[in-house]
Regions:
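Short, basic and Ser/Thr-rich N-terminal targeting/leader segments
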Residues: 9-12, 91, 109
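A structural signal for short, well-ordered beta-strand segments
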Residues: 15, 71, 95-97
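Conserved Nudix-box catalytic region and its N-terminal flanking loop in Nudix hydrolases
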Residues: 22-60
Length: 141
């Protein structure tokens, strides 16, 4: 599967993990969005169901075992290079998730992982669709 300059869009999942008025974000260790804070998540594997992928990605990136609940949104993430070619194209399916076990630990693609309260989010320069889905998650609690 070619992530950079793909021939077709890739399907990804996001796990919006909210607990005690805080949300889990990971600092990406690899492109795209390397060194930026983001929702835990990643690309589906062949034969994997979207909720299974959300569970796997949350565990891989945060050390937490989660239970995916409500679908919060489906978003397009298209990033272009300097020549305006599509460098990355993802269709992202984001679920509100509840932690059922585990301790927060950066793993896999995450350089860092931590809990954030709402008031900290504006300073992180998150993408507008990322902020939107996090707001939706907070509104459901």
């Amino acid at each position: 599967m070619q992530r950079e300059f793909p021939e077709v869009p890739l399907v990804g999942v996001g796990a919006i993990i909210i607990e005690h008025a805080r949300v889990v974000l990971v600092k990406r260790a690899h492109p795209p969005l390397q060194a930026e804070w983001s929702i835990p998540g990643g690309v589906l594997e062949v034969g994997e169901l979207v909720r299974q992928a959300a569970i796997r990605e949350a565990r891989e990136e945060t050390g937490l075992t989660v239970e995916p609940g409500e679908l919060l949104g489906v978003y397009d993430r298209v990033l272009r290079d300097a020549g305006k070619r599509v460098q990355y194209h993802y269709v992202l399916i984001d679920f509100l998730c509840r932690r059922v076990a585990g301790d927060l630990t950066a793993a896999s693609d995450a350089a860092e992982v931590r809990w954030f309260v709402r008031e900290e989010l504006p300073a992180l320069n998150l993408a507008e669709d990322t902020l939107d889905v996090i707001r939706k998650g907070f509104a459901k609690l």
